[in-house]
Amino acid sequence: MRQTIKEIETNVAYRWFIGYDFSQPIPHFTTLGKNYVRRFRDTQLFESIFLRILEEAVHHGFVKPDVLFIDATHVKASANKHKYVKEIVEEQAKKYQELLDEEINQDRIAHGKKPLEKKTETSKKEVKVSTTDPDCGLFVKGEKERVFAYSFHTACDRNGFVLGAKVTPGNVHDSQVFEDVLNQVRKTFAQPQAVAVDSGYKTPYISKTLLDDQIRPVMPYTRPRTKEGFFKKHEYVYDEYFDCYICPNEQILTYETTNKDGYRIYRSNSQVCRSCPFLKQCTESKDYTKRVSRHIWADYLEEVDHLRHTEENKQIYSKRKETIERVFADMKEKHGMRWTTLRGLEKVTMQAMLVFAAMNLKKMATWLWKSGRQKVNDQNTFGIFIKLLNKLPLLFVQRGSLSAICETDYGLFFLPFLIDIG
């Protein structure tokens, strides 16, 4: 803000934008800073701006929310990766843990097993917390590099308009925030027909959620994580009728138990495996027993893999590089979001919503201009922005006045954000 005020004192374009003449004194930077703290902290101001611009894009018919593209990207935090403290924290339980526990016990009872006792103690883990910005999270980039970062979980449509976003610490996995982003979009738009995601979201629960809600999941192929020289899991055929697996040597692996993570365990007969010619390609177990796991929601994953081969899924997934990946590329390359200069989850969320609002606004202004529906004097992106702000009566007392206490033009208030994101 200090540098912005300094630039305004000598930059004619900035003065013109905020409506100040050459002789009019510029307010002190603390006037704007304190006014923001008093009026807009802990409010939904920036989300309201984002939604209002998105509403305008919908009005012009530019938004196509029938197919969603959801992904996340990491933005480096304004924090030194060498300045941290180690803390012991409780592991956060999965949002669907109660549903999973209930179905695990039902499955165990159906197989003649006792239900698992409810876990009372919460597991703990050691994490590194930045002393500069405690809200960010340590993100492992590649095999060696570790940086403190934030994750921007984002959803866009087939035209590249951002429909929803959520910011979390960088150590939160993408799949844990998927449902929050999806529900955020569903509050504004009708339920999508399809959702395209990358392999990080290919989990049993997400597959179940989408299929149960009659949403078409569009997910990629994932390579089997098997040691080289060993049989792949798909070479063990599951027999649904007899609830067993058949190994490549046509021997039976019978049900053993269902564990606390929701996986059924099937085991072979060690006496048969001991003399099997494929033993070295099957297992390294010292007791000559092969075990295969299958999640209780594996049927949903199998349906996802079946849909992956359809022409519709192939066409939708091929659009990811033109939609959500393009959004992240523009955000970092054209809007200065390779790293954030702000600290704290609240401020970074504010910055993210402003950046995405600006991206939607610029795309809408460009499309209006190309379609010939925008008047000549309204082609300027800032002009459209001001018109949209005028339609937010809850945010401003009157045009040109940011507050009753501080007589400051709102163009001056938003100028530093537009400089950063423009």
Enumerate the language-model features and the residues they cover.
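Anion-binding and metal-coordination hotspots
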Residues: Q3-T10, G19-G422
